[in-house]
């Protein structure tokens, strides 16, 4: 059963069309990530779901009840939707407990018990309850904001870049904790982010937006390995795009013969590999002939864990750049053997 249904949502600001024909379903307890470049319309879409913006056309339905259609517009505060903004937006004049209590109903004792339960749910130390927002860390502030949103028992949780202000290590652990918490509570969630890796790791469903349209919606691994087009492929991660001539059998390209995910295609086309599909094996000497593809390292861009190797493919006299895990023994001038793992993805023209 779907928690949220979007049907043909459109939105314009004066003559500028920012959303066009948006169809999207979010199932109960699932996690959806909406990604796209700046100006693609993802924030506007989330604001429409929350009730902060009104679409020009279409329908928004939550648990079978219309939030917006030609005759209905439910205001934001009556939608039963939780909202966690980028910076948490905690009330600075309330303690952590006071922020969590905001909007809770019941007696003082009931609220206190509910605050304790919510702090436990988001793994917040009870000793933080009486601290002010500026006295706790960024990760703790985001957990307070999440607890405050959970206190309303929402059917749907909206998360706007909620981890972007955290440092790298804290971002990963907080993201995992939030994902697990929402799943355990069976609360559907929508994350808006510009971080592709964050979207892929958080979500069960990823929706890629471009120029006000949803261009590809599906499971993270499906979108990553079989994107609908080249712009989507490059947006979701590093790519190696090649132009082989496909004949009966495996196509031949700069990296040798490559297995593809659509063997029925023939003729000139473009294929995609992800960098992790290319295994780079150093050769003891230039006279050791590989069984796959011989290349020479012509430059190295070292960036810590990852390095970008610029390679000259000997047989085809072509240059390719491949990102790989940094390791000792790799240097300019080294001859290497390139082996492709798995299938290349063919783009449909």
Swiss-Prot record:
Enzyme Commission number(s): 7.2.2.7
Limits of the ABC transporter domain: 4-236
Locations listed in the record: Cell inner membrane
CDD domains assigned to the protein according to its UniProt record, in alphabetical order: ABC_Carb_Solutes_like
Record InterPro entries: AAA+_ATPase, ABC_SmlMolc_Importer, ABC_transporter-like_ATP-bd, ABC_transporter-like_CS, ABC_transpr_FbpC, P-loop_NTPase
Superkingdom classification of source: Bacteria
Record-level GO cellular component terms: plasma membrane
Membrane topology, from the record: Peripheral membrane protein
Task performed by this protein: Part of the ABC transporter complex FbpABC involved in Fe(3+) ions import. Responsible for energy coupling to the transport system.
Protein name: Fe(3+) ions import ATP-binding protein FbpC
Gene name per UniProt: fbpC
């Amino acid at each position: 059963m779907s928690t949220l249904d979007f049907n043909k949502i459109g939105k314009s600001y004066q003559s500028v069309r920012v959303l066009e024909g948006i169809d999207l379903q979010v199932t109960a307890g699932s996690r959806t990530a909406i990604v796209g470049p700046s100006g693609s319309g993802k924030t506007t879409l989330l604001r429409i779901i929350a009730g902060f913006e009104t679409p020009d056309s279409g329908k928004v339905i939550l648990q079978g009840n219309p939030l917006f259609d030609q005759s209905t517009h439910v205001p934001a505060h009556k939608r039963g939707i939780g909202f966690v903004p980028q910076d948490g937006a905690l009330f600075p004049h309330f303690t952590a407990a006071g922020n969590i209590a905001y909007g809770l109903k019941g007696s003082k004792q009931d609220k206190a018990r509910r605050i304790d339960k919510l702090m436990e749910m988001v793994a917040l130390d009870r000793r933080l309850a009486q601290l002010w927002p500026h006295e706790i860390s960024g990760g703790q502030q985001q957990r307070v904001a999440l607890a405050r949103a959970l206190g309303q028992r929402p059917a749907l949780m909206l998360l706007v870049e909620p981890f972007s202000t955290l440092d790298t290590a804290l971002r990963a652990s907080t993201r995992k904790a939030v994902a697990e918490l929402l799943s355990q509570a069976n609360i559907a969630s929508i994350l808006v982010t510009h971080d592709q890796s964050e979207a892929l790791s958080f979500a069960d469903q990823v929706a890629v937006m471009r120029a006000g349209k949803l261009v590809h919606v599906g499971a993270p691994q499906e979108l990553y390995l079989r994107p609908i087009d080249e712009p989507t492929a490059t947006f979701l991660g590093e790519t190696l795009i090649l132009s082989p001539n496909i004949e009966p059998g495996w196509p031949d390209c700069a990296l040798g013969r490559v297995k593809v995910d659509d063997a029925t295609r023939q003729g000139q086309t473009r294929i995609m590999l992800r960098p992790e599909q290319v295994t780079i094996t150093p050769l003891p000497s230039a006279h050791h002939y590989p069984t796959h593809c011989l290349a020479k390292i012509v430059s190295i861009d070292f960036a810590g864990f990852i390095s970008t190797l610029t390679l000259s493919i000997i047989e085809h006299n072509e240059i390719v750049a491949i990102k790989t895990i940094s390791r000792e023994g790799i240097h300019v001038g080294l001859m290497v053997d390139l082996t492709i793992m798995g299938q290349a993805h063919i783009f449909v023209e």
